[in-house]
């Protein structure tokens, strides 16, 4: 690690293979916490390269406990986090709405690091069982249309990093990696990212795979469609800009999509929205993100996807998916 750190401090970059090997050695426990923290800090001070990101991704995918759910042709809706916006759990809510619309979802998530309440914090509070057992996950996706893949159960190699990330409490390159390392290897993916540079990297890396994808970055900084302005999109064959009017709705203010300050408050907001008791702004932002997921899988327009999502939310199908998952978890 000393040699790697010296190279990085001298503004060198790692090859794809070097990057992969560093992560493999971290996973094996070959480095101490100070060395790992120093390594992570380098990437807070300079941009990661595509080669480095690809190497880190390859290491995590090679080391993960893979689960085959390909028969369901699922999608994952996952943001990098780290946008500093502290919204409510939009992509997790959108995942249940997407499932309610009949599109199968393998939701990859984790506890919050740079936000007070990540996807897994809310799921755990609501009684969702975290499991890496194939039978349970298949039963979940069969009966609820969605299964939750809690990252630490599938990436045991990262147990050496989790406490350091928690102590640092700022975004690291692991935020960038999260959506790329879903252990179900879903063929469909919605990824929200915290800056345009990362959107380009994701687009480049995904174009070299067989994934059907849409990368999202709200131009005012959100790692999802926020409806507070325009959103950059990169998909398999196109790039574009989405505006609120493309979903048939008006723009909203940042304050209208603020999240809870505690897990309890976040869970309350989550349930209120799924019950159809959310504000118009909350409902629309959830349905815009779910709508893009539905559009990505079914090959329809964002507006058509949005309408399907709205029907799922307001008819209670999204809530039904959550309730089913809760029952299976009991």
Can you say where each PLM-predicted feature lies in the sequence?
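Acidic, glycine/proline-rich low-complexity segments that act as flexible tails and inter-domain linkers
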Residues: 1-87, 101, 105, 252-257, ...
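A generic, well-ordered mixed alpha/beta core segment in the N-terminal half of proteins
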Residues: 79, 83-140
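Short amphipathic alpha-helical face segments that pack within enzyme cores
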Residues: 38, 93-97, 285, 289-292
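Short acidic alpha-helix initiation/capping motifs at coil-to-helix transition points
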Residues: 1-2, 14-17, 32-35, 113-117, ...
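Glycine-rich anion-binding loops and their surrounding alpha/beta cores
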Residues: 7, 59-65, 87, 102, ...
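A generic alpha-helix surface/boundary motif
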Residues: 17, 92, 117, 121, ...
């Amino acid at each position: 690690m000393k040699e790697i750190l010296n190279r990085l401090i001298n503004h060198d970059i790692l090859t794809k293979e070097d990057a992969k090997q560093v992560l493999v050695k971290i996973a094996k426990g070959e480095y101490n916490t100070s060395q790992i923290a120093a390594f992570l800090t380098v990437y807070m001070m300079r941009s990661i390269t595509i080669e480095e990101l690809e190497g880190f991704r390859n290491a995590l995918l090679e080391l993960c406990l893979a689960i085959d759910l390909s028969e369901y042709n699922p999608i994952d809706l996952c943001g990098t986090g780290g946008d500093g916006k502290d919204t409510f759990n939009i992509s997790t809510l959108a995942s249940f709405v997407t499932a309610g619309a009949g599109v199968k979802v393998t939701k990859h998530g984790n506890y919050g690091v740079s936000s007070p309440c990540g996807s897994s914090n809310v799921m755990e509070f609501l009684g969702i069982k975290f499991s890496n057992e194939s039978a349970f996950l298949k039963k979940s996706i069969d009966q609820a249309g969605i299964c939750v893949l809690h990252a630490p159960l599938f990436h045991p190699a990262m147990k050496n990093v989790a406490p350091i990330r928690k102590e640092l409490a700022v975004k690291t390159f692991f935020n960038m990696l999260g959506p790329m390392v879903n252990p179900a290897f879903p063929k469909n993916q919605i990824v929200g990212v915290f800056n345009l540079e990362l959107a380009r990297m994701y687009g480049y890396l995904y174009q070299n795979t067989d994934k059907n994808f849409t990368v999202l970055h709200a131009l005012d900084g959100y790692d999802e469609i926020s409806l507070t302005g325009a959103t950059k999109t990169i998909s398999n064959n196109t790039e574009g800009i989405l505006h609120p009017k493309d979903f048939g709705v008006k723009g909203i203010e940042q304050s209208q999509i603020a999240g809870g300050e505690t897990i309890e408050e976040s869970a309350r907001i989550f349930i209120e929205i799924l019950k159809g008791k959310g504000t118009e702004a909350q409902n629309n932002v959830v349905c815009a993100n779910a709508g893009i997921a539905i559009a990505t899988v079914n090959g329809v327009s964002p507006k058509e996807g949005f309408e399907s999502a709205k029907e799922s939310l307001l008819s209670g199908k999204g809530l039904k998916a959550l309730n089913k998952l809760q029952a299976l978890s009991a």
